[in-house]
């Protein structure tokens, strides 16, 4: 069980829920980072009293320093600030809940400082999964998944031999537009896409869930986290979001993890593993459950999932290009610069233009990330 934590991305959805869990569990918070929401960060500082905080830029750091005069708290900014947050000497676990590839370098930095990782930033493994897992093994660092699906798989694998696993089954809600055709999707607005039927999440991941890119990123994450081949990872649409994922074994047995669709549950487990602690979260009532149904994902209509599979098949830097293009396209959609279906179109065009490096180092991945963002922006303009 974690005793002292640092959090990068403390003002986002996962960060806020992590602090709630830490408060309930009596876990000390050593350091926090946020991008621009310094009003909320200030409130978090007053409540949790970290030693160090970091914000997105120097102007925000100056404002934060003025607000926190007399508290004896070190205020930092940028990537260097996030590095200082994750390397805090007292913290034994770092919760990485920033959105996108902004979490990659701080996560690797934390691993190299031998901090256990509660991983909510799936883009870290999407873009640099092999490097991250090799670093974790070399530094004897444990990576605990925070995503509900990967937390479920983690639990379903416990006590079983890896060679006896036949396949991992990732469940997906199907998002708010399940069953719609491409023509109907063309007119979807950001407001409509931000209404997820089951989960309460941040804007970017909610759009990713609507396009099914989130599930595609989770497939790539699962490949590295659980060291599985692509053909042993299946996606099933499960609209009720009660079964969070499953593992099928060679004898035909299937182990599933069920629970209410509440992110606080996997967050708490990532902090307390191998223990389970009491809480006041809603418990699953089987007598009130709707019928549990399953269907194949429509990868022709929701092309992002197909593109994610393709990027993993190609390998190398292609997943990094896919991820970066997606981040730019989603941001453009949220700002009404492109339509819903143009998210996938933009990603596909970036992938078609990318010259893949099959054996990249970290610097190569960062370079591709920058290239893909620039290319996506040019396509959108």
From Swiss-Prot:
Q: Which GO terms describe its biological process?
A: isopentenyl diphosphate biosynthetic process, methylerythritol 4-phosphate pathway involved in terpenoid biosynthetic process
Task: Provide the coiled-coil residue spans.
Answer: none
Where NADPH binds, per the record, is at 11-14, 37, 121, 123, 202
InterPro entries for the chain: DXP_reductoisomerase (IPR003821), DXP_reductoisomerase_C (IPR013644), DXP_reductoisomerase_N (IPR013512), DXPR_C (IPR026877), DXPR_C_sf (IPR036169), NAD(P)-bd_dom_sf (IPR036291)
What catalytic reaction does the record list?
2-C-methyl-D-erythritol 4-phosphate + NADP(+) = 1-deoxy-D-xylulose 5-phosphate + NADPH + H(+)
Annotated residues that bind Mn(2+) are located at: 147, 149, 218
The record's Pfam families line, in alphabetical order, gives:
DXP_redisom_C, DXP_reductoisom, DXPR_C
Which pathway does it operate in?
A: Isoprenoid biosynthesis; isopentenyl diphosphate biosynthesis via DXP pathway; isopentenyl diphosphate from 1-deoxy-D-xylulose 5-phosphate: step 1/6
The coenzyme or cofactor needed here is: Mg(2+); Mn(2+)
The GO terms describing molecular function are: 1-deoxy-D-xylulose-5-phosphate reductoisomerase activity; manganese ion binding; NADPH binding
Q: Would I find Metal-binding among this entry's keywords?
A: yes
Taxonomically, which superkingdom? Bacteria
Write down the PANTHER family for this protein, in alphabetical order.
1-DEOXY-D-XYLULOSE 5-PHOSPHATE REDUCTOISOMERASE, 1-DEOXY-D-XYLULOSE 5-PHOSPHATE REDUCTOISOMERASE, CHLOROPLASTIC
Q: Which NCBIfam families match?
A: Dxr, PRK12464.1
Q: Sum up the protein's function in the record's words.
A: Catalyzes the NADPH-dependent rearrangement and reduction of 1-deoxy-D-xylulose-5-phosphate (DXP) to 2-C-methyl-D-erythritol 4-phosphate (MEP).
Question: What is this protein's name?
Answer: 1-deoxy-D-xylulose 5-phosphate reductoisomerase
**Native species:** Ruminiclostridium cellulolyticum (strain ATCC 35319 / DSM 5812 / JCM 6584 / H10)
Q: What lineage does the source organism belong to?
A: Bacteria, Bacillati, Bacillota, Clostridia, Eubacteriales
Q: Which gene encodes it?
A: dxr
């Amino acid at each position: 069980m974690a005793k002292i934590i640092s959090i990068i991305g403390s003002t986002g959805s996962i960060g806020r829920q992590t602090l709630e869990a830490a408060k309930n569990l009596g876990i000390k918070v050593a350091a926090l980072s946020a991008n621009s929401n310094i009003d909320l960060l200030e409130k978090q500082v007053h409540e949790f009293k970290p030693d160090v905080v970091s914000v997105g830029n120097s102007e925000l750091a100056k404002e934060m320093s003025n607000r926190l005069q007399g508290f004896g708290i070190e205020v930092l900014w940028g990537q260097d600030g996030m590095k200082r947050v994750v390397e805090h000497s007292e913290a034994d676990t770092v919760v990485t809940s920033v959105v996108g590839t902004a979490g990659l370098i701080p996560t690797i930095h934390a691993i190299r400082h031998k901090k256990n990782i509660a991983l909510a930033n799936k883009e870290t493994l999407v873009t640099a999964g092999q490097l991250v897992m090799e670093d974790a093994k070399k530094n004897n660092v444990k990576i605990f998944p925070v995503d509900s699906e990967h937390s479920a798989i983690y639990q379903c694998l416990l006590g079983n031999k890896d060679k006896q696993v036949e396949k991992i089954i990732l469940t997906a809600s199907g998002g708010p537009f399940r069953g719609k055709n491409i023509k109907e999707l063309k007119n979807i607005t950001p407001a409509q896409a931000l209404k997820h039927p089951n989960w309460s999440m941040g804007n970017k991941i909610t759009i990713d869930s609507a396009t099914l890119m989130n599930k595609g990123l989770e497939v790539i994450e699962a490949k590295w986290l659980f060291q599985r081949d692509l053909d042993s990872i299946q996606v099933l649409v499960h609209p009720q979001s009660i079964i969070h994922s499953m593992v099928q074994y060679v004898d035909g047995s299937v182990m599933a993890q069920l629970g209410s669709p509440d992110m606080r549950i996997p967050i708490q487990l990532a902090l307390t593993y191998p223990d389970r602690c009491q809480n006041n979260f809603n418990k699953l009532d089987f007598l009130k459950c709707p019928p549990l149904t399953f269907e194949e994902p429509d990868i022709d209509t929701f092309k992002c999932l197909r593109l994610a599979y393709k990027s993993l098949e190609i390998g190398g830097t292609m997943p990094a290009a896919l991820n970066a293009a997606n981040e730019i396209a989603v941001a453009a959609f949220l700002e009404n610069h492109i339509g819903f279906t143009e998210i996938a179109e933009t990603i596909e065009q970036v992938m078609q233009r990318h010259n893949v490096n099959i054996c990249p180092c970290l610097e190569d991945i960062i370079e591709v990330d920058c290239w893909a963002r620039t290319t996506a922006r040019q396509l959108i303009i």
